[in-house]
């Protein structure tokens, strides 16, 4: 793509916003430019910037992210700022939080959750609030209102073999300005169970001698004063493998794997190997196995971590531009991809194999007889090999699905900007599965003309029959390594 950036009245796309940031940093780091020099060259220097963005894929992503039919409901949050001068000369400031409190306490809407059913309903509430605040003769110094369509979404699609970012979308709804919040690259959100793969199971397989058949006990589990449960409740299942832990997103299996085999320190180290840069020392805890992080992660970095798995364990820094030429056609920067081996190819394949099961119809039965199903079947795409992992945070504040095919890796985040829990039913603000449908719809369209080569099995993979209960090589007639004791 030959791009000459100019200031204009049409807001840049989310991709262009990130491209500007990436090019600016490259000009500063590689050529020694100041912020001002880089900006002047970028917008007025006649640069030719070549990007790997795929216009057709980008169009598909934008269409599906903004298609109302892909959402169970549409509601609106408000970013509100109001400054008043009271009759006594005092200046006071108000926000969406004070508006929410007023609606709950003064207007009797105790159940108001910060979301409105329409823009008109939101504006009516704002008008009433302003009127109530100015009844004493206070005057308005300034006011700003931004309506935000909820639930929000971000999407990232990467070609894992090259690191080329083919498309991103930083939020649904009309983009009204340049360099606004880009939920795909700027927002740090809790990753939930997607992080089990990165911080617990990947290092266990890669560095600690575990296999997909290594077993951990799914039962009551606590650390310090914190008690952990599985996402389906307190109905435990006994001994289960790492493969089961991934397929059914078993919290206790992931926690015991980190505690007994990996250690939180190694878990954080592996997440950083896979390109997660937002971790801090306080994240060296067991909660990291479940994605309970201090700051959270960006969609771009989380998706790219899975792209490394899809690429046989080779991490490639995300590429938004391939080269920059000056106005005379001279190459200023040739952006060669930065790569490193983050995982063994055997580890990457084992994780891929287990995450294929996530997207297939599998059911595991609890001791009470109730069924727990694999968590990614809604996202499965027809006639194409795919592997992935879902993630949901406490109270359904964030929902994720990150997965890949032999061609592309894609990640979707869903949630409300104001951290309102996602709900279904009669008070729906989006539900907790819409993101998987969007992921499936986008990836189905992207792969329509592509054949399915399957996932390549590396030469380093060896197969063997193992005891299902112990994860060890079986003994003919009896499994003497069964953790419950010999038969």
Question: What annotation goes with each model-predicted range?
Answer:
Residues 182-212, 217-220:
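Active-site rim segments in enzyme catalytic domains, especially the processed small/beta chain
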Residues 227-231, 261-304:
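Mid-domain, small-residue-enriched loop/turn segments at the edges of structured enzyme/sensor domains
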Residues 1-96, 272, 277-278, 287-291:
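Non-catalytic, structured segments within soluble enzyme domains
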Residues 28-41, 165-179, 268-282, 381-384, ...:
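Active-site-adjacent bridging/hinge elements
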Residues 5-9, 209-267, 327-357:
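Conserved catalytic neighborhood of penicillin-recognizing serine enzymes
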Residues 28, 34-43, 225, 244, ...:
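Substrate-binding clefts and substrate-entry loops adjacent to catalytic sites
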Residues 51-74, 78-89, 93-147, 151-159, ...:
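A penicillin-recognizing enzyme superfamily signal
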Residues 148, 153-159, 165, 197-201, ...:
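C-terminal substrate/ligand-recognition segments
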């Amino acid at each position: 793509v030959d791009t000459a950036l100019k200031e204009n009245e049409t807001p840049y796309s989310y991709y262009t916003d990130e491209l500007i940031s990436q090019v600016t940093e490259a000009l500063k780091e590689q050529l020694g430019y100041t912020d001002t020099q880089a900006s002047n060259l970028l917008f007025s220097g006649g640069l030719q910037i070549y990007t790997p963005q795929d216009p057709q894929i980008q169009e598909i992503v934008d269409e599906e992210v903004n298609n109302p039919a892909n959402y169970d409901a549409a509601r609106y949050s408000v970013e509100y700022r109001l400054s008043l001068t009271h009759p006594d000369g005092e200046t006071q400031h108000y926000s969406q939080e004070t508006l929410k409190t007023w609606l709950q306490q003064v207007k009797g809407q105790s159940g108001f959750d910060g979301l409105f059913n329409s823009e008109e309903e939101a504006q009516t509430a704002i008008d009433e609030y302003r009127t109530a605040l100015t009844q004493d003769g206070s005057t308005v110094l300034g006011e700003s209102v931004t309506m935000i369509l909820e639930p929000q979404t971000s999407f990232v699609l990467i070609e894992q073999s090259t690191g080329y970012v083919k498309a991103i979308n930083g939020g649904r709804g009309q983009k009204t300005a340049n360099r606004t919040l880009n939920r795909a690259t700027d927002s740090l959100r809790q990753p939930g169970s997607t992080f089990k793969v990165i911080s617990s199971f990947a290092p266990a397989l890669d560095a600690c001698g575990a296999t997909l058949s290594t077993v951990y006990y799914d039962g009551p589990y606590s650390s310090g004063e914190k008690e952990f449960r599985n996402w389906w409740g307190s109905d435990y299942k006994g001994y289960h493998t790492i493969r089961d832990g991934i397929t059914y997103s078993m919290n206790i299996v992931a926690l015991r794997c980190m505690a007994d085999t990996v250690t939180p320190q190694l878990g954080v180290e592996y997440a950083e190997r896979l390109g997660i840069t937002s971790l801090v020392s306080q994240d060296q805890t067991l909660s990291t196995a479940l994605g309970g992080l201090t700051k959270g992660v960006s969609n771009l970095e989380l998706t790219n971590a899975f792209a490394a798995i899809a690429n046989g364990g080779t991490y490639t820094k995300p590429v938004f531009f391939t080269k920059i030429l000056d106005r005379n056609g001279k190459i200023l920067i040739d952006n060669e991809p930065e790569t490193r081996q983050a995982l063994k190819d055997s580890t990457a394949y084992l994780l891929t194999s287990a995450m294929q099961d996530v997207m297939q119809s599998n059911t595991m039965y609890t001791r009470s007889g109730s069924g727990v199903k694999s968590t990614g079947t809604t996202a499965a795409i027809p006639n194409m090999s795919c592997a992935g992992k879902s993630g949901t945070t406490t109270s359904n504040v964030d929902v994720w699905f990150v997965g890949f095919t032999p061609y592309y890796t894609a990640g979707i985040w869903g949630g409300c900007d104001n951290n309102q829990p996602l709900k279904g039913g009669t008070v729906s603000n989006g539900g907790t599965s819409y993101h998987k449908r969007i992921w499936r719809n986008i990836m189905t369209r992207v792969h329509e003309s592509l054949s399915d080569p399957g996932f390549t099995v590396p030469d380093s993979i060896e197969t063997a029959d193992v005891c299902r209960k112990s994860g060890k090589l079986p003994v003919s007639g009896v499994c003497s390594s069964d953790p419950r004791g010999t038969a």
